[in-house]
Amino acid sequence: MALWGGRFSQAADQRFKQFNDSLRFDYRLAEQDIIGSVAWSKALVTVGVLTTAEQQQLEQALSVLLEEVQADPQAILASDAEDIHSWVETKLIDKVGDLGKKLHTGRSRNDQVATDLKLWCKFQITELKTAVQQLQQALVITAEANQDAVMPGYTHLQRAQPVTFAHWCLAYAEMLARDESRLQDTLKRLDVSPLGSGALAGTAYAIDREQLAGWLGFASATRNSLDSVSDRDHVLELLSDASIGMVHLSRFAEDLIFFNSGEAAFVDLSDRVTSGSSLMPQKKNPDALELIRGKCGRVQGALTGMMMTLKGLPLAYNKDMQEDKEGLFDALDTWLDCLHMAALVLDGIQVKRPRCKEAAEQGYANATELADYLVAKGVPFREAHHIVGEAVVEAIRQGKALEALSLSDLQKFSAVIGDDVYPILALQSCLDKRVAKGGVSPQQVASAIAEAKARLF
């Protein structure tokens, strides 16, 4: 039975009911709805609506219902209830009779669903933070094992300067640390309870909403009832967090797809995260990474869709806001799955050090070192930059690396170049010189790994 039938003389058209009902997705809020109902029953005791004995009876029945939901949440979907609130109330009445009809006193589905969703978001943030931390840990472990794996760093997808695979791993660990920080910031803002705001104007019962918030584990209660039932900022923020996080994972996936390609051949991916071709027997496709990259779009779409849903809504609650859940649920599920999959990819990755080093030695990745060498000899940097560009052209013409050019060849471009240039152009020297904080020198990379381990393990 609908919770609002008294006003109507005709039953809802079945097609409208199917269009209007939300149980098929908001059943995921069942645990939160029950937890909120227990807290609300306690609040009703404080204002004389329920006796202590009645509240205890309701709480016991709700606790049994919670256990049933936890044992088989999918069983909820067999009901034709309009939404999860209707389902919980109906089940409660089945257990305790008319006493269950008293529970909704002073409460609206507007503040009820806002509370349920915030409680769900709080739990989900905890899950996501754990997954983000686990992926950071996987990156740090991989970095520690590959500190000596020299490879080319890229700009414009052109070889630029030598780095290490460890330094690459730590770059993504930094991105994930920001993702974790964003989740924590989102939690701070959503950690206020809307329960007790009623439909829009507040409840007529003198309930201590701060006490109620504390029972639910919120830091405080909201300050304005209109805003409380209208606010979906936390949905937007979480979708934004997920969108940014998925951009990071998509870039991670793209890098590894390239590193795994036959053209780069820097890494081998585990058989556990790759698949084959139905036609070409030689293929080993990076499907896990391609799916991570592909799923980024659906998460961005959820954020855009939610922003468009909210942008024209007047205060307070509107049915449009029922559209807040499916996109949020899917986006956060997707992000969580991709975080786990990215960690699995790293678990079995093999870095091909000889090939990485070979690539780093090509493409004139040490050209900047020659420019810095000239600067140290008193040549202005802009002039040094031009000189090295000419030297690179000559090296390309001869089909040689910069360090393979003879001293006489190099001195054609600048007389200040001496024999001491050759150690400077060595690959390891290029790394060793990057000693400033955040650089790719072995000392800085080791320090960054130590800092990350202290934070994460």
UniProtKB/Swiss-Prot annotation:
Its EC number is 4.3.2.1. SUPFAM superfamilies: L-aspartase-like. Pathway: Amino-acid biosynthesis; L-arginine biosynthesis; L-arginine from L-ornithine and carbamoyl phosphate: step 3/3. It comes from the Bacteria. GO terms for cellular component: cytosol. Pfam families: ASL_C2, Lyase_1. It catalyses: 2-(N(omega)-L-arginino)succinate = fumarate + L-arginine. This is Argininosuccinate lyase. It comes from Yersinia enterocolitica serotype O:8 / biotype 1B (strain NCTC 13174 / 8081). The gene is argH.
